[in-house]
């Protein structure tokens, strides 16, 4: 099985919250697609709560689009990581980490403005696969955590696992 890009970086050295360019590629039409690792939690030390990450998934996707789309950028998708330490964001364009971090920070502030569970987008059995598994309170705690700690940058060249280490794992 091929080694995926996300497993070539040392998770023991990742900072959080932090933005990382996980991958950049070109489409046949020469559009740039960039995948960002938006790391909310320090891997293997912290984890996003199940209900909190689910609620955040519903809120974060819209708020990030509000703050990042435009000027050559269009978000394709924002999805939670299976390890529950962050989200992957795929987009058309190549914004720098500072622009993504500023949008992320603004989106977390927006999350805190949602004051009622009933205001969570798509919170119904028709549009959500587990619509009863939400917590606005936990999503607020995650947003506050990000805002209090600030958003840094993780760089692939600083986190790359050496080839010999990859072979031994």
Curated annotation (Swiss-Prot):
One Pfam family hit:
LuxS
Question: What enzyme category does the UniProt record give?
Answer: lyase
NCBIfam families xrefs: PRK02260.1-2
How many cofactors are bound and how?
Binds 1 Fe cation per subunit.
- From which residue to which does the signal peptide run? none
Role this protein plays: Involved in the synthesis of autoinducer 2 (AI-2) which is secreted by bacteria and is used to communicate both the cell density and the metabolic potential of the environment. The regulation of gene expression in response to changes in cell density is called quorum sensing. Catalyzes the transformation of S-ribosylhomocysteine (RHC) to homocysteine (HC) and 4,5-dihydroxy-2,3-pentadione (DPD).
Identify the cofactor(s).
Fe cation
Q: Do you know which PANTHER family this protein is assigned to? A: S-RIBOSYLHOMOCYSTEINE LYASE (PTHR35799:SF1)
What keywords sit in the KW lines?
Answer: Autoinducer synthesis, Iron, Lyase, Metal-binding, Quorum sensing
GO biological process entries:
quorum sensing
Please state what the protein is called: S-ribosylhomocysteine lyase
A molecular-function term among this protein's GO annotations = iron ion binding
In terms of Gene3D superfamilies, this protein maps to: S-ribosylhomocysteinase (LuxS)
Oligomeric and partner information: Homodimer.
């Amino acid at each position: 099985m091929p080694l995926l890009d996300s497993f070539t970086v040392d998770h023991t050295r990742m900072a959080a919250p932090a933005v990382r360019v996980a991958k950049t590629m070109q489409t046949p039409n020469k559009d740039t697609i960039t995948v960002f690792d938006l790391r909310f939690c320090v891997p293997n030390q912290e984890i996003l709560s199940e209900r909190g990450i689910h609620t955040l998934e519903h809120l974060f996707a819209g708020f990030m689009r509000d703050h990042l789309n435009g000027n050559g950028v269009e978000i394709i998708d924002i999805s939670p990581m299976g390890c529950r330490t962050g989200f992957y964001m795929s987009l058309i364009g190549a914004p720098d980490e500072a622009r993504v971090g500023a949008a992320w920070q603004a989106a977390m502030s927006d999350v805190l403005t949602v004051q009622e569970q009933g205001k969570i987008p798509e919170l119904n059995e028709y549009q959500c696969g587990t619509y009863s598994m939400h917590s606005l309170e936990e999503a607020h705690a995650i947003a506050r955590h990000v805002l209090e700690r600030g958003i840094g940058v993780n760089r692939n060249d600083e986190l790359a696992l050496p080839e010999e280490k990859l072979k031994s794992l």
